[in-house]
């Protein structure tokens, strides 16, 4: 690390220069970056974007303004905006010890704010993944720099490629498109503690819909037996099957998860019809 930080509590606004050869945040390795900022009184203002290499891509801090810095008895408040460019989901999930994802994330983080130890994104987060679109709303992180941060968010998934998704998770091949609604997500210490998610085939989609034998077997383990219309002997004969729709609902509360799908006449449910 090298540079010069000048701070004036008077009328002058000196410019600080700082170069960082490398760092880490939440186990994420961060590459070399530099910054130019103005320090005046209890305010810090970024003068030009900071571009930080991270997990195969870049995170750019486009704007940043903090007030209450180093002021006695005052909690700092800051506002910022940032962007993500080609951040590797595979590397990110590996470092955070999450289930492995493939692909990259490119998106905008607007109206970011930190106050009273709570980080929020007022404008939401839009990015692309698995050849579809993901929007995250109502994102907040309580005590983000503490030992047990609490993340809350809602999200919508639109037009995700099931082929890309199932190949990433080695679940067994499924072809088609997938929509989803994730409500009341809560991560405690970056581990899932609560959520409700509905995953389903979008209406009007003309994408090819095929499901492999392995995927049927894995869904069968999640559900309550062989899907209606299929027998164990048929599973051994055919490698792939056509399907009409997918409908999967999962609710997690603590260590208890509940699974549901499309209602069947016999009182059960379909995960794949």
Tell what function each PLM region has.
Residues 1-273:
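Membrane-proximal interfacial segments on either side of biological membranes
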